Structures are given as structure tokens and as C-alpha cells.
Amino acid sequence: MKERSDKSVDKAAVDRRSFLSVALSTCAIAPLATLSLQLATSLAGSLTKEQRDSMTPSQVIDELKKGNERFRAGKMAPRDYLAEKRSSAAGQYPAAVVLGCVDSRVPAEIIFDTGIGDTFIGRVAGNVVNDDMLGSMEFACAASGAKVVLVLGHTACGAVKGAIDDVVLGNLTGLLARIKPAIPATKFEGEKSSKNAAYVDAVAHTNVVLALAEIRRRSPVLEELEKKGTIQIAGAMYYLTTGVVEFLG
């Protein structure tokens, strides 16, 4: 009986050593595995500088994709907005800057399931690029360290419809003029009118593509950061009926 007891003790010691070995290995790996998950903040607060800086542009985009998957599945991360407010009050370290449309159905923070302090958001009808938006993107990336510039278009865009219909209305006229280059640049077979949803969406897609080119052309600051691999300039389309965000290219 004593011999059996000794063997049990020895086995227990081995089991403890094995457990500690595995645990230590897991602890060493865990930071690398979890840092890229911080856009899905739970109840701890906003992104820290260390967490944001540890991520590559590709990892940031992957997290935006995962956030959209959670949104579509109705399994969004639990959040304590008061904790996020407190943790971000002394400083912000967003991982991405999103240029989206003013459309009330396309709230980027929600469709990507990000919290307070996780993303810079700029919104204007038709997600058009102008000097103010470019300056905001440069601030987000060059001054604040964001890793991704994302232009987010969407289906059934009213601004795109207005550009197709050549709407003239106060200051809106000048804004729509920024979208109009996407109309002749869109290759489409079928009825080319604002009543054709497929055509409107095709023009909206082209509008995003042209916006990406315009950002690179008009902002040497962002273009240089992208060439260095510091940031990634990307485009995406949000589908109102499904909630899917489809990244371009």
C-alpha cells in the first residue's frame, strides 16, 4: 500500500510539473495571440497604446472583419461604455480611421463592433474625399498612430443616386460633383438610372475605388506611410440588407 501511495505522489508531482510547464508556455504565447483581439474589447476598456502598436495593418483589418461577423451573428462583444470612457479619457489609441457615408444606417462603430477609443470615424455624404477628410486621416495615422485607412461605401446610397440624377440643391451640388467621376468610370450593362439598384451599387463601388486612388494621389503623407508598410489604405462596401462588409481586392 505504501509503494502504491509513493507512486501516486510521484505521479501527482509529475502532473503538477506538466501543468506548470503547459501553463507557462501558454502565458508566454497568450499575449501574442490576444493582442490582435483587442478591438473586440470586452469590459476592460479601450485599446491601449501597447495593444494598438503591437498590431499590423493586416491584423487590424482582420479584427474589423471579425467584428462585422459578430455584428451579423448578433453576438457582439459585451461592453462597459463607462469603463471605456474612463480608460480613454487620458488618451486615445485607435487602430483605424474610417471614412464612411453620413447615411444613418451605416454606423461604422456598430457594424464593426468596436468601442469607444478603438476607431476614428469621419462621415460625409457619399464618403467623398476632401481636404478636411485628408487632414483628419493624416492626423489619425501620422500623428496618432492608426494602422488602417478604410473608405466604407454602402448599397442604396442616396448621395450616389443624387449624383446619377444630377441633383442641384445648394451646397449639396458641389458635394455630388465629387461623386460624378464614378459614373462614367463604372462598367455596367443594363439600365443606368437611379431606379436600378444594381447600377447604383456598381457606381458606389467605383466611387470607393476612386476615393482610394484620390487619397494616395492627394496625400503624400499617407502614400509614404503605406509604402513603408506602416499603414494600409483599404476600401469596403457595406450591404444594408445583409449587414455584410465586403472588403475590396
Region spans (language model):
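N-terminal secretory signal peptides
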Residues: 1-14, 28
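Twin-arginine (Tat) signal peptide motif
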Residues: 11-20, 34
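Divalent-metal-activated hydrolytic enzyme cores
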Residues: 20-27, 31-32, 46-91, 117, ...
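Signal peptide processing junction and immediate N-terminal pro/mature segment
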Residues: 35-45
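Active-site alpha/beta core segments
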Residues: 90-97, 103-109
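Short beta-strand segments
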Residues: 99-101, 123, 150-154, 234-239
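Active-site cofactor/substrate anionic-group-binding motifs, chiefly glycine-
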Residues: 102-127, 132
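Gly/Ser/Thr-rich loops at beta-strand to alpha-helix junctions
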Residues: 104-105, 154-159
